[in-house]
UniProtKB/Swiss-Prot annotation:
It catalyses: (2E)-4-hydroxy-3-methylbut-2-enyl diphosphate + oxidized [flavodoxin] + H2O + 2 H(+) = 2-C-methyl-D-erythritol 2,4-cyclic diphosphate + reduced [flavodoxin]. The keyword Isomerase does not apply. Keywords: 4Fe-4S, Iron, Iron-sulfur, Isoprene biosynthesis, Metal-binding, Oxidoreductase. Binds 1 [4Fe-4S] cluster. This is 4-hydroxy-3-methylbut-2-en-1-yl diphosphate synthase (flavodoxin). The keyword Iron-sulfur applies. Converts 2C-methyl-D-erythritol 2,4-cyclodiphosphate (ME-2,4cPP) into 1-hydroxy-2-methyl-2-(E)-butenyl 4-diphosphate. Pathway: Isoprenoid biosynthesis; isopentenyl diphosphate biosynthesis via DXP pathway; isopentenyl diphosphate from 1-deoxy-D-xylulose 5-phosphate: step 5/6. It comes from Alcanivorax borkumensis (strain ATCC 700651 / DSM 11573 / NCIMB 13689 / SK2). GO terms for molecular function: 4 iron, 4 sulfur cluster binding; 4-hydroxy-3-methylbut-2-en-1-yl diphosphate synthase activity (ferredoxin); 4-hydroxy-3-methylbut-2-enyl-diphosphate synthase activity (flavodoxin); iron ion binding. PANTHER family: 4-HYDROXY-3-METHYLBUT-2-EN-1-YL DIPHOSPHATE SYNTHASE (PTHR30454), 4-HYDROXY-3-METHYLBUT-2-EN-1-YL DIPHOSPHATE SYNTHASE (FERREDOXIN), CHLOROPLASTIC (PTHR30454:SF0). InterPro entries: Dihydropteroate_synth-like_sf (IPR011005), IspG_bac (IPR016425), IspG_bac-typ (IPR004588), NO2/SO3_Rdtase_4Fe4S_sf (IPR045854). Belongs to the IspG family.
Amino acid sequence: MEPEVKIERRKTRQVMVGNVPVGGDAPISVQSMTNSETCDVDATVGQIRRLQDAGVDIVRVSVPSMEAAEAFGKIRKQVDVPLVADIHYDYKIALAVAEQGVDCLRINPGNIGREDRIKAVIQCAKDKGLPIRIGVNAGSLEKELQRKYGEPTSDALVESALRHADILDRYDFQNFKVSVKASNVFMTLQAYRKLSSQLEQPLHLGVTEAGTFRSGTVKSAVALGALLMEGIGDTIRVSLAADPVEEVRVGFDILKSLNLRKKGVNIIACPSCSRQNFDVIKTVNELEARLEDINESVDLAVIGCLVNGPGEAREVDVGLTGGTPNNLAYRDGEKSHHITADDLVDELERMVRAKVKKQREDEEKGIIARSE
């Protein structure tokens, strides 16, 4: 078997967003953002709980008004995931939401205003022990930088970030992370590469306004994947014009593809052709939906014929090779038993869940053994 490639990550300071470490040697965390009206407490709480079910590490909530800041406090009491307050324009909202149990304040250098306002936010964050994210966006750069560069560029994004990092540094505040997002993949890549060589703070990766589910997934996978392979990035958010739960799924899939996080069922499936002995696409789609609740790492291969099936099945936890008259199942790389086409989904689900149960039992035994 090909040896697993280990990505050497850039060493950064570590900050804590609630109970989730970001930076240092911490696992790369996956974030998402609610798209409900924050003042609709029930809707926002419901969405956050769905994100938690999907495995999200950190959730950002827009706080556009004092009313939203008050609603944030009610939301905070009903969920137990770290929450970031997304603040634009009015620094006083940041001060207000800091009293409501927030875990991190995101400010936008392009619209937060004068240095005295930033100083007030810094002092508040110090008093409350909160980290700050300097969130630079190509679409909302400071007017001065817009005039200087004429249009958004990677240099403009980096200059904005470094200016505000310098402000935080002058007020002896190091508990922050930074993002420099653009909707253009190349601008995003260049900005993060330049910034990573000039700051020791953790970097929050993302392609802003990436697009629809399909196009946004592609852009994010290309940009974030390239940066992560270079060891750049400590937390990610995949921005999609879609259900926020999809952002979490795509985020984890990006990390899983690079062996940076192990979570959930990794389905390996052929694209299918006329050699398939069962409906591969229908089978894997149904399996993916049924196995969404699993957080343990399990590799499942579903291959429609004998060309590549045995080779793939021998490398995974649970495998299936299409055959005539019946399909052959593999368990831990060894041939196990035959399955008819009608029983494929039920039997593969049973095998995966049995594997998960065994993993949990082995982990429990290990914990008991270590405690003795």
